[in-house]
């Protein structure tokens, strides 16, 4: 027996990474998991080194970021790699989730895997928001003010919760200090949940583009799929380096190069681009409480997907209607992101409300109806084939 199998610790690594049996038909969309792991490592490492030079005091937070950029050797690289790493983390995560939606990876027996994935998504959004506030630029200050103010919509106790979050009567020194403490903690929580995600994946193995159980047609992870993962890793690092070295502020906001000033309100208050679709859903509802409920529901509705999809065939590879509505959903989601970035005015108000309705309708109305129609068509087609054989 080889050492990697006899050693109790290396045997775990071996069973998950080296000898793990993978379906032979999986394509490059399945490489997003390894890229997400790489992004998490980049974020944790750059974050730890930046935390050595960052000060969470509100009087020094903005200056300490500039100190990292100007005085710390390689500090500019740490800051830009961390900021752009967050954007690339969400790019890979949205692609990973889109792959799961398209190929039906949320279906039984992988409901637990999907649920843990949604939890990782929520934790990642929370971590990104907390980190965005730590910069304490102009947009960070007002973003923190607006988003934390959402809790005031909770009846009876909402205002007390906001004061508790702030540690005062406005975003102030205690706010930034506790946000930084949580921002430092959450990536390690995410790493722990990622391990749970891999454990859940290990129970039934990866799905495949065909949507069938392929236990008889599998290959070891190393060196077939490890090599395939390395290809996308190199492509990712090239694109990531282009942004870090040549266009580091493309996915940021210029107002964050201005120190946070509670006396001056920006022309428009917007979060980072990866939160814009949910920000658009929040703004599409006139009532504050209902807007907050709708925004959180837009994330939690992902958890009902395994129960609303009643199709007898997993995935959309062989389903024309499901393909059409999936790509319409993707277009609608991108449109929500664009609407979240513009001012609340005509015609974007109505467009946001229609897009929000279509977002929820996809999960709660379209998928159940389409899966039922396709089940009937599959049944009719199978009966016709049976009659032809007779």
Swiss-Prot record:
> Which Gene Ontology cellular component terms are annotated?
mitochondrial inner membrane; respiratory chain complex III
Subcellular localization: Mitochondrion inner membrane
Cofactor notes: Binds 2 heme b groups non-covalently.
The residues that hold heme b b562 are: 82, 183
| Cofactor field | heme b
Domain of life per record: Eukaryota
Annotated membrane topology is: Multi-pass membrane protein
A GO molecular function annotation here is: metal ion binding
Predominant location category: mitochondrion
Complex and partners: Fungal cytochrome b-c1 complex contains 10 subunits; 3 respiratory subunits, 2 core proteins and 5 low-molecular weight proteins. Cytochrome b-c1 complex is a homodimer.
- What name has this protein been given in UniProt? Cytochrome b
